Swiss-Prot record:
Its EC number is 1.14.16.1. GO terms for biological process: L-phenylalanine catabolic process. NCBIfam families: Phe4hydrox_mono, PRK11913.1-2. Pathway: Amino-acid degradation; L-phenylalanine degradation; acetoacetate and fumarate from L-phenylalanine: step 1/6. It comes from the Bacteria. The keyword Iron applies. It catalyses: (6R)-L-erythro-5,6,7,8-tetrahydrobiopterin + L-phenylalanine + O2 = (4aS,6R)-4a-hydroxy-L-erythro-5,6,7,8-tetrahydrobiopterin + L-tyrosine. Binds 1 Fe(2+) ion. Disulfide bonds: none annotated. Fe cation binds at residues 154, 159, 200. Keywords: Iron, Metal-binding, Monooxygenase, Oxidoreductase, Phenylalanine catabolism. This is Phenylalanine-4-hydroxylase.
Length: 313
């Protein structure tokens, strides 16, 4: 989803009719000639494999090697199995077409290349039709540990392996379908929180202990350690009502992680019609990202050490 904020208000060489969030990376691509002929109405484009540089492939290898060494025993088995099934490797930025051959056979999903963040309704439309929009470009070598918007490593390494799992794949499609409805009902803030605390930063309980499944964690060296090992954050049992009222942080480690018991639990949470829930929750105050409230199934209350004081989203 579109979570980054627009950059400066300088003139932008965007194609006529462009309605997306103008981030630095999009401005850069428009300035380099990305136009309405290259960029389709649904914001997709051909993966420009000819534009990957040696530095791009080296960055992929560096990031891949770090996570490959770190994630066994931290990432959930379903993620690791998906990574193996897709045949993703350290060799360089993968071909989306090659990954799609395996992905389509497994769950009917496909990756579509996009230049960056896309408008919410476009994003939901893709998910509802089992298409995952992935940024084609790679972060710079000086951005290995943080960048403002998701790049190809975050989107492909972080998100795509779980799309091999049938239950998670169904959840993502249901989320897209729900997003289209939420947009009409003015409830995108609540649904965005569900995405953030599950797809991006979710943990899962397993017989071997807590494991990571959120893409924002599995694609990050430092948060892969922090999410499981640090005493600072809260870890709270999954509750869709609670999550939809909980604000979040985009610029630092999470103050709270929500823990599911299974992907089936996650999928089942999307089955009901959310319309009455939106109406009920819309009248209630939101919670801060680090709040622990009555009724929480608290696995551990964080020490709050190192928490930033600036505002949540």
């Amino acid at each position: 989803m579109a979570i980054a904020t627009p950059t400066s208000a300088a003139p932008t060489p965007a194609p006529a009719g462009f309605t997306g969030t103008l981030t630095d990376k999009l401005r850069e691509q428009f300035a380099e000639g990305l136009d309405g002929q290259t960029l389709r109405p649904d914001f997709t484009m051909e993966q420009p494999v000819h534009r990957y540089t040696a530095a791009d492939h080296a960055t992929w290898r560096t990031l891949y090697d770090r996570q490959e060494a770190l994630l066994p025993g931290r990432a959930c088995d379903e993620f690791l199995q998906g990574l193996s099934t897709l045949g993703m490797s350290r060799e360089g930025v993968p071909s989306f077409d090659r990954l799609n051959e395996t992905l389509m056979r497994a769950t009917g999903w496909q990756i579509v290349a996009v230049p960056g963040l896309v408008p919410d309704e476009v994003f939901f439309e893709h998910l509802a039709n089992r298409r995952f929009p992935a940024s084609w470009w790679m972060r710079r070598p000086d951005q290995l540990d943080y960048l403002q918007e998701p790049d190809g490593f975050h989107d492909i390494f972080g998100h795509v392996p779980l799309l091999i799992n049938p239950v998670f794949a169904d959840y993502m499609q249901a989320y897209g379908q729900g997003g289209l409805k939420a947009a009409r009902l003015g409830a995108l803030d609540m649904l965005a929180r569900l995405y953030w605390y599950t797809v991006e930063f979710g943990l899962i309980r397993t017989p071997a202990g807590l494991r990571i499944y959120g893409a924002g964690i599995v694609s990050s060296k430092s948060e892969s350690v922090y999410a499981l090992d640090s005493a600072s954050p809260n870890r709270i049992g999954f509750d869709v009502h609670r999550i939809m009222r909980t604000r979040y942080r985009i610029d630092t480690f999470q103050k709270t992680y929500f823990v599911i018991d299974s992907f089936e639990q996650l999928f089942d949470a999307t089955r009901p019609d959310f319309t009455p829930l939106y109406e009920a929750l819309g009248t209630l105050p939101t919670f801060g990202a680090g709040d622990v409230v009555d009724g929480d199934a608290v696995l551990n209350a964080g020490t709050r050490e190192g928490w930033a004081d600036t505002a949540d989203i």
